[in-house]
Design a protein with these regions (language model features):
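A conserved acidic beta->alpha catalytic loop
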Residues: 37-46, 100
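Short, acidic, metal-binding catalytic loop of nucleotide-sugar glycosyltransferases
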Residues: 21-30
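Short beta-strand/loop segment that forms part of the nucleotide-sugar
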Residues: 30-39, 62-63
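Conserved nucleotide-sugar donor-binding
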Residues: 148-163
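Active-site nucleotide-sugar/metal-binding loop of Leloir-type enzymes
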Residues: 76-92
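Non-catalytic, C-terminal membrane-associated alpha-helical segments of glycosyltransferases
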Residues: 208-284
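Short beta-strand-to-loop acidic/aromatic patch adjacent to the donor-nucleotide binding site
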Residues: 89-101
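Conserved donor NDP-sugar-binding/catalytic core segment of glycosyltransferases
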Residues: 101-137
Length: 284
């Protein structure tokens, strides 16, 4: 299968070499790799140039944006800029972060998944992060049928059906919900162990939690599902304040009448899907 990779990169000189090296070693080679140099002021650009010489399918796109960390919107905006440079001749498209190391056979196995399971729209492995001893251990705070936003592969038909990625926090949740809305499945493979070099949530703060609550509003979760989802995250993180911050973000978005990310019909489907999952867990 033919596939293309888009890698948003903002000041990634520490990790980018490892990420691009893992792409270069893939047993199934991509047809193109676009690294979006998003307003970097470190050695990110020179690293991309170095790899472009080694492997001509690796291309650089430089854009100018804010230096602020904007969870969700900044990375998706960079991805969308890269998407504009792509040819249309791919079977699946990959959104990859600049701080992950993929196993050499990663995309060979992703291609097998898409070939063998025509209904699969999104596929990926699991993230492993270093603990205090330096050992890589699985860190997957979401459900096992969720693919982390750092290494997502989308079947072309699914990507087009859901209208690409939403430029907002929560994009890597709404994409899977919309994929299911359009009749596609999510597939995770436990054998695909991805090394994530930057611990999850390291750059997140109170502002990010407010945006998370806003995302739940814009996905049309409704208050009760937002409350349950926020409480679950707060419990897993051991941070009660994150529950309050999420709810504050939700009601701020509601009072400001922020535009929704999904249609009324999509929202109805999403709520039904969420309630089904919640009830399923309660009955276990």
């Amino acid at each position: 299968m033919r596939y293309s990779i888009i890698i948003p990169a903002h000041n990634e000189e520490i990790h980018l070499k490892d990420a691009l090296s893992s792409v270069h070693r893939q047993t199934l080679k991509p047809t193109s790799v676009i690294v979006v140099n998003d307003n970097s002021d470190d050695a990110t650009e020179s690293i991309i140039d170095e790899f472009s010489v080694i492997n001509p399918i690796i291309q650089k796109l430089t854009i100018i944006s804010s230096h602020l960390h904007m969870p969700g919107s900044k990375v998706v905006s960079a991805f969308q800029n890269g998407l504009q440079q792509l040819q249309d001749d791919y079977d699946f498209i990959v959104k990859m972060d600049a701080d992950v190391i993929l196993p050499d056979h990663y995309f060979e196995k992703i291609a097998v998944i898409f070939n063998n399971y025509p209904k699969v729209g999104i596929a990926g492995g699991f993230a492993y992060e270093q603990d205090e001893t330096g050992e890589y251990k699985r860190n997957h705070p979401m459900d096992n049928d969720h693919v982390r936003g750092a290494f997502k592969s989308y079947r072309k038909d699914c990507f087009l059906a859901m209208g690409g990625l939403r430029n907002a926090m929560g994009w890597d949740t709404v994409d899977e919900l919309l994929a299911k809305f359009h009749g596609f499945d999510i597939h995770t493979d436990e054998s695909l162990k991805v090394k994530h070099l930057r611990p999850i949530g390291k750059a997140y703060n109170k502002r990010a939690k407010l945006l998370q609550g806003k995302a739940m509003y814009t996905m049309r979760y409704g208050f009760l599902i937002t409350l349950i989802a926020s409480a679950k995250m707060a419990w897993k993180q051991g941070k009660f304040n994150s529950l309050l911050d999420n709810l504050q973000g939700y009601f701020s978005a509601k009072n400001a009448k922020i535009p929704f990310l999904v249609t009324v019909q999509e929202g109805s489907f999403i709520r039904a899907l969420r309630w089904e999952k919640i009830k399923g867990k309660l009955l276990r």
